[in-house]
Amino acid sequence: MATPQLSPGVLTREVDLTVGRAENVLDNIGAIAGPFEIGPIDEPTDITTETQLINTFGKPISTDAQYQYWMTAASFLTYGGVLKVVRTDDDDLVNANGNRSHETVVTDLKIKSYDDYVANYAGVGQTFGYAAKTPGTWANNLKVCVIDNAADQVLGIGTTSGVSVGMGVSVSLTNQVIAGSGDTSSFTGHLKGIITGLGATTIDVKITQRVTTAGVSTDITYAQGDQARSILAGNNVSVINSSEVGVATAKIEGGNYAKDWYDEQTMGLTNSTVYWKSISPRPDTSNWAADRSSKNDGIHVVVVDDLGDVTGIQGNILEKNLNLSKAKDAVSSENAPQKIFYKDYLSIYSEYVYAGDDPSDGSDGFKAASDFSSGYTAITAASGGWNRNAQGITFNVIGNDTYTLTAGADYSATGGYTATLGNLITSYNLFKNKDEIAVDYLLMGPGLGDKAASQSKAGRLISIAGERKDCMATISPHRADVVDLSLIHI
């Protein structure tokens, strides 16, 4: 019988040393700070590839030799490992942002990071509509296209003299067949709606109720082409004010018309015509809101590179954020427990923008359209405002709107990329506590404009390495001392 013993008392055994070994032990951890094109401010971010470096912090730029910082980072990554990158702050850095109807933008808005947004900009009362995710000129001229379910139909009525947003519309129905669940019924009374938008010869209408001759109201939702739920050709339309007095009438015939509102909506782009219906069906009341006796919370937010300044492709649709909600507590019915409140969703999932002010409250000077309440009285901005939990709320509507982001600025008013010594030191100080952040190599990158500043930068990195006692500082000489020197013959 075979035996593993080669000699008395000596036992040989094969051991797989891969079992129980330490996995994913990180080494070769670098750290660098610099004036990068994009990215969060003063927040260390782990980067492992050059592609990730470009996607997170932008490409190398020749202005002010910014590429020297980028090349230092990229060179380190070629050896593997992890590079912790910090984008340095500057007084001139500003996030591109936009308000409704191209009103004055905020020229000093600086949202440094997601944490900064949550702490200081996610609440009510903001002065910007939408803002770029990070500071810089990179987002200038991006467009944020927004649409909700502001109207069901657009009616061409010839003239809108004496008509205003918030008034009601009424269409008489006689012996109208109503489809039910397995049966039909006959209805006599009138179809009722509210005016949510106004043109020179057109009104935008949202269908809200059917009212019997006895005054019994039933809430309904619009259905295109259904006489029991929409206004059709041949109907006589009456416009009613809040005192329930008729102020105008029109028959949908001849030059007058009734069209589906959403089918007519296009994005506010300069270089292309894109219909919203080609992007997604109309945003509707979410299941979350409907289950809580609320409505009109649905909203789409789409980011477009209209001029091609960001991607080089005019009209490039960068991202579609669809079927979001105006309700602060809204949760997706398809991906629970994912939050779909538009501010929360964009802050987490959008690569390009944050949302700021509630655009339905009229605080930006743009007329706030309202939805239907009772009788022919429009809901006030206060009672239908966004940013509240969905419980018995008929959310205000804004319709189809476009925000153009402008006023973004880099490290100088003229688009420079020079970081100051003080701001660089602030960024490198984020690496000084070895108990909070692991670092093996502190990368200085290039020196600064004068020799004393270059020496000060190097000195601080050496000091941090000395305080930590677990890493090395890699130092660069002052550029003027080693580059373009004339030969000296002795």
What positions do the PLM features span?
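Surface-exposed assembly/interface segments
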Residues: 1-488
